[in-house]
């Protein structure tokens, strides 16, 4: 009986979750970002665009925590960087690319940056 009651309570509670799709726009009317929330917390795909309409950033959230591949693009549509993230923690190899799409810098051992590489992180989306 206790097990059945717990399942009922979980099912009842799940009906009260509020999922909302949110879009924000630049003053000029172009789409700036799109994401979903569950009970006010980001959950699902997050996307952000440059003013020119080109995708600038895409990531995934689970219960408000980054989880999955974070991708950042240059305004010309070329991938700028990829970050493998698991439950809010950077895991794996981060890759940075130049404006022509050539791999220019990576994070390797123990997910620590190679400090001999210099990269300009200003102007990221």
State each model region's role.
Residues 1-7:
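Positively charged n-region of N-terminal signal peptides that target proteins for export
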